[in-house]
Amino acid sequence: MGVKKKKEMQVTALTICHQDLETLRFLADVEGKNLASLLLYCVQLTDGVSQIHYVKQIVPLLEKADKNGACDPIIRSCLDILAGIYLSLSVKNPLKKVLASSLNGLPEFFLTEAIQSFTSRLQEELNTTDLYSYRKVIDNISSCMENFDLGRAGVNNLLKNVLHFLQKSLIEISEENRKFAGNRIVQTQLMNDLLVGTRVSVMLVQKIQDIQRIHLKTSSSPTWQSMCGLLSIFTKFLSDDDLLQTIQSTSGLAVILFIKAMFHPPEKIPDLISSLLLRSVDCTSIPDWFLNCCRSLCCTDVSQSTLLFLCQGTLTMLDWQNGSMDLSGEALLLNIVHILFTLSSQIKESTLELFLSRILASWTNSAIHVLKSSSPSLKNSLNGKSSVVGRLLEYVYTHWEHPLDALRHQTKIIFRNILQMHQLTKEKSNSEVSGLAADHFICDLTEGLLRLEWHVKGKYTCLGCLVDYIGIGHILALAKTIPSQILEVMGDQSLVPYASDLLETMFRSHKNHLKSQALDSTWIDEWHETWVSPLLFILCEGNLDQKSYVIDYYLPKLLNCSPESLSYMVKILQTSADAKTGSYNSRGALGALMACLRTARAHGHLQSATDTWRNLVSSARIKQGLIHQHCQVRIDTLGLLCESNRSTEIVSTEEMQWIQFFITYNLNSQSPGVRQQICSLLKKLFCRIQESSQVLYKQEQSRSKHEPENELTKQHPSVSLQQYKNFMSSICSHLFEALFPGSSYPTRFSALTILGSIAEVFPVTEGQVQAVYQLSHDIDVGRFQTLMECFTSTFEEVKILAFDLLMKLPKTVVQFQDSEKLQGLFQAALELSSSTKPYDCVTASYLLNFLIWQDVLPSSLFDSLKTQQTACEDGDKSAIVVERNTLMVIKCLLENLEEEVSQAENSLLQAAASFPLYGRVHCVTGALQRLSLNNLQLVSEWRPVIEKLLLMSYRLSAVVSPVIQSSSPEGLIPMDTDSESASRLQTILNEIQPRDTNDYFTQAKILKEHDSFDLEDLNVSVQNIGASAEVKGKERKTCDVTAQMVLVCCWRSMKEVALLLGTLCQLLPMQSVPESSNGLLTEEQVKEIGDYFKQHLLQSRHRGAFELAYTGFVKLTEILNRCPNVSLQKLPEQWLWNVLEEIKCSDPSSKLCATRRSAGIPFYIQALLASEPKKGKMDLLKITMKELISLAGPTDDSQSTVPQVHALNILRALFRDTRLGENIIPYVADGAKAAILGFTSPVWAVRNSSTLLFSTLITRIFGVKRGKDELSKKNRMTGSEFFSRFPELYPFLLQQLEAVANTVDSDTGELNRHPSMFLLLLVLGRLYPSPMDGTYSALSMAPFIPFIMRCGRSPDYRSREMAARALVPFVMVDEIPTTIRTLLAKLPNCTDQRFRQNHIHGTLLQVFHLLQAFTDSKYRLNTYFQQELADVAVCTRAKLWLAERQNPCLVTRAVYIDILFLLTRCLDKPTKGNQPAVECLGFWEDVRRIISGSELITGFTYTFTVPGLPQYLQSLTKLAITTAAVAAQAGEQAGNIPISFSQLLESSFPEVRLLTLEALLERFSTAALGLGEKGLPPLQRNMGETFLMLAVKENHPECFCKILKILHCMDPSEWLSHMQRCIHLTPKEFLIWTMDIASNERSEVQSVALRLASRVIAHHLQMCEETRDSVAPTLKQWVQLVVSSCGEHLPTESRLAAAEALTSTTPFLLTSPHPVLGLQDTLALWRCVLTLLQSEEQAVRDAATGTVVTAMSQENTCRSTEFAFCQVDASIALTLALAVLCDLLQQWDQLALGLPVLLGWLLGEDDDFVVHLENTHQVEDYLFEKAEINFWAETLIFVKYLHEHLLRLLSTSSRRPLSPESLRHLRRTASEQGHLLSQLFRELPPAAEFLKTVEFTRLRIQEERTLACLQLLAFLEGKEREDTPVLRASDSPAEANQFTLAKTETAH
């Protein structure tokens, strides 16, 4: 919300040559009043901004001189100097424009002299011969022509010279560009010069052609010759593909412009250009000069780009307006568009595609201009039904989903222009309405667009254009629910911007329409109903994403359009806020209300905060919103408080109180998005405070004039300022308290981020600036130590935030007086940098950086460097201090590393166990990354350090490479479970030297051939390892080393070396020449680094190794491409050619690593190509792709297998690389061909690589999968769009598919000949026809359909299924019924003798998938839909034998039954005035006959070995369930039903029972939630007895689980009464049986049984006393069961069941005024609630929060808190639960018995502290065991809340609740624990918080618990805190004490 600071203007001061300076000195008068004096003073200034002031005084001074009527020599000389000054200024210098503007006002008297001066000076400029000065001259010519009269006059005077100069300069620059081919940096500058020169030539001719046409009349004139020369140059540029396309494009403009200027007569120009474009130039009829200049355009074939840019030039440079075009011009217009259509189908390059789209849009603009005064024939050619418009629309439909945003934008322009063109071709109509109704083009267009699916982005833009064109009325008449439809899709982020823009267009149009027709204000009701009501529905009921996007995109636009609608929305939401309170997954009306108010306030639709709180929303609602269970409600409420459209709006007292309340409970958010929003909103609030405080300070300063008042609080500014200070100080205190020991990662992240924002918003001020708050004032030693302690976090984000915050504090805050402490910190950092724990070195890096930047390194480090220190005292003190410190630390680390590498060279095992090497390297990299290495002052000292660093990196890499580059480092090193592993490691490390060769493919598996696997080689190698295991290592001491340690040491060392080398390349300046003094890296060192990366990328076999090298290599290549050193700049190109040659030659001796994915080779080439500048021609990419695609193609040469696999793998990597963007798209078609053909290879490696490449291409073409459905509409493309983007694939795919289809139906079904069918169907299945496809495309999808149908006859089951899925998108929705009938007709009759089940199955699958697509379409329920389905049903009945026993194949029977099932579902809908179509057709009789005759009734003779039996059972059961359900709903008698639910449940097949139970469970669940329309039918309602009997005898686990779930859903009163009669169990016995199941079964059944038992208990407890007493004895077992289900180690489902059990029994067991259970059991249940509230699982916490909400909403507890009946978050639910519990203890009068238990919770008696301490020592043995990582639960927060509530409880208690004996026991326990803690603190080493973080944190937490307990005990004894013998500071070591003292109050 802060106001952006205005960017300061940078103006370079003007200067003049020495001679001119002397002239001015000579001419200046003594008084300093003449022009020379003014100019002299001006040029002597060094500030350009000040000079502007004096430049503006020139003309006023000359105006005075003009009155004297003489132009004296002084002024003449000054004008000459001014001309020189103007031409010397750079084109971007603001002084140049200021000077031109001033001289434009020159008095007429001086114009002649001034023009002469400018002409003279410009002539001097034109005479220059220095090629690298040409650009400056060209810029000057350009400047003279732009709004500068003197300059334009000078150019006119020198036109001949100027043209000659431009011709000469362009020729010479072009030649220079050719010489520097390959030097990108120089070429970029030269091409830019060419571009500017071309543009200036165009501008020159445009601006002076009318004045200078006389020069062009004679062909011998120099001007004419120069023009011809320039035209020749531009023609050459136009055809030169080595130039930038912008140069070619501008040359196209220049060619047409020059032709227009030079060709006579002008009326023949359109014909001439037409003949040029159509390649039909008659060379005999054109002038010789034209033929000489444009011969390449007239007589040879031109490239696509040349033709394209000529079209662009024609449309831009010819005058299409004002009716200036005759019939030849109209013909040219039509010729251009047909050429563009042709080019559209040929161009593949993305940049040219973009050019074409812009040119096509430009063509539509020109067409509109011409149509305004065109001939009737042109209007006929361009009306809505014309072929041109049809093809334009096809272009729009094809490209409106294009990946390039700019191209999609052009389609919108084209579509909008098409509507305008159509409007201009229409005949005028008397009535707008009749005109619209009669306009078939617009009507068809509108209906076609509305028929499209909403996932099509182009639909939105085109509908928006239509609304602008015809208004909203017609569209609302066709689709009244369109607002709801659009809002429905706003859950998809990719569609949201399009949808919101369309909605805005629509509701604004609708509002204007209604207002224009209305007589009063009632129109707003209709507008609200149409646009606001759907919005409110989404806000209350929509899904999370949908609501968020609607609020962010739609709501602001709606309020901006109609601010008065806010009160309407608030009124509706206020009334429903109590009913719709929301939950953890629903915002409810309260959330919607907060979102609306937040948006309104942020956009300035609320007058002030005070009005908002008073009139629109209550304080209680605000607080509810701030702790609501739904995170977005909390965020929106916070946003309402923080955001304002006025950055200086004063923050009210209420707002500050609410913010404090919010921060208390919302720092610990697990969602990164929520944390980011909280921090962002609070930063906005702080900016408001900062900016409004400045306003208050100003008011305070002016109070002497009048008494100012705060507009909100009506109080003095000083009071508000003091409130601000108190508020900020309070916030910071709370944030520092949140960094307590054991605080979670989210809490620390949030607190540190907010503190960082405070430090940023309230910076340290200097001078007179008044600051309302400064964070540094609130930082003491304790808080400083707290921030330091954050470095020990296992999350690097926390370390970064803490470090950044410390860096923002002034150095005076950070005071280190104790040199021992400094030495200890430095030693701790060094120790951590060599720790065996991988995360310790990160802590070390931050510690060292902190010591470096704060200049607090121990003095002992500098003892050997006194001379350097004295030499560094000059210059920038702070920068050089940091540089010196960094250098010293790196030297220290290097010395240690050198020693350790030497030891590692002798024994890698010892290094891995004692000093893994990577930590030191990590710290070096960390130190270098924070230092600005481009302007070092100690260069001479850095050079040997860098050299040593490089050598050390290579040595270290050599030590670990044997492990990294071995064939299998993980496999060859034995696992830690082997007791002899440590002794065998060294021997094995010697065994795993790399022995990889390039013979990977020599034994490639060929299809239909089998290779035997010989175990002897493996046995020999195992024996060798075993024999060597006795060899002892040479280390002096025994190392406790594991295989994991060795691997981590080696892999991380390699990673750190790669990152270090990459960092050095990226940050260190390179020496441009060997003797250069400014660079640190020499050319030779850079090449060495490149060779290092090359070796690891090309020869490492493991992904981890080459990925690490890739990271550094990318940094190196990026630097090399920008390097001015030409030899270094060309290195990537040389490396690329070398590796491509090595891949092509396939030499067996090659060192390239050949694996199934080519190891690091693709990464290597990827890095080389991705670093190529994207703005160039991308020549390396083009050549490489050409080579790779030729290698990837099929080959008969077995020697080519390795290159083919490499090529396929490299192509895959390149297509995956997003950095290549659209530049890779032209090669997609060839890549797809290679992948599909490669899949047919007999070599497995080729097939494997082809599959991977194909998968990548599918993602590249159709996008990353964005839906659950494999063929999601979001990942599909219309056939026309696909084939227009990749036209080469049309004939290829069709040909391949035809080849497959022609052989797949043979008698033998030779599938193996065409394994590519799978890939073909996969591609085709992602295409679909669009209703907008026109008839103009030659790329029709129809030819594919018969071949896909034939593929359905494949003998392979998966292929038949894929063919069926692939067919669906090829058939238009309204053609599906016809296609289904055709397919059904092909099925055999029961009388046919010969038929193949594969054919039947394939056809039936196609019918099924087509029918499924049709029934899912939007045609549901209309008459057309029902009629078409009825016709399909008739055809289906004709082949009914396929579903009966006459068909022996169960697979085809199953599919046919699935078809019947679909039909019964869709036909069972009554049409208007008729009974359901199913009944009319007699369909149910057929279905019942099939079921009656099926094996479900007669029994099965099959076993599970019969193919298709499970599938058949499932299909038949689904149909039977539908039949039974329909009959039950209709109330039919049991005798009329072929099979009942009870019979299905008695089936011997579990599949049948499971499906039936699932169907019944769905119905019972719906009925239990009250979502059913009429409840359960009678036949289903009375099944309780059936389920009881099933529950007892069911053995199948899943079925048993479903039965228990159904019983849980049913009302227990419906079945408990039948229990004794049905299963002979009493309620008590049934409860025990259920709990036994919950105790013994697996987790899912256990959870369901616990829920069921809890529901039964709740039912009994609310019944009569006798029933209650019967279950009372079993409650203790139930309590134990619940307690055992709450452990954090248990599955989530168990804990969710426990939470649900607690919620259902809360009113009876947890909060009952008369407890049923004993106090111990009741408190045990409450402890369960508190445990679940601290779970790491969000779902568990939410469920437990439901228990708390229930608990505090009972009659006897609703006054315990202020949030009764509110949906609250788990963070506040914890304290609310404790509040309710303490209140209940008083109600029950059980304080004396309950208090010891609660004090035990406080002390942590349930956590065995001693066991924890013993386990701590074992932690050291595990390499990656970081500590008890907590993402949410915080022990001390629980302690804090419990302490607060117990203190409040004891304060309000009227009598002492505990006896002296109880007090003594508790005190003794706490005191013993305190003394143990003291002893343990003393045993810790110095800097324990860093070196022993886990133990230190655990001790600190226990210390806080002990202190809290002792304080309460002291309070109980009536003593003051000071008299309590608690743990004292002196009991802790000094190192721990500094932290402990600062944190004593944290938990209180």
Curated annotation (Swiss-Prot):
Residues 1935-1948 have a biased composition (Polar residues). One of its GO terms (biological process) is tRNA methylation. The modification Phosphoserine is found at S1012, S1021, S1158. Keywords: Coiled coil, Phosphoprotein, tRNA processing. This is tRNA (32-2'-O)-methyltransferase regulator THADA. Residues 883-915 form a coiled coil. SUPFAM superfamilies: ARM repeat (SSF48371). Together with methyltransferase FTSJ1, methylates the 2'-O-ribose of nucleotides at position 32 of the anticodon loop of substrate tRNAs. Residues 1924-1948 are annotated as: Disordered. The keyword Coiled coil applies. Belongs to the THADA family.
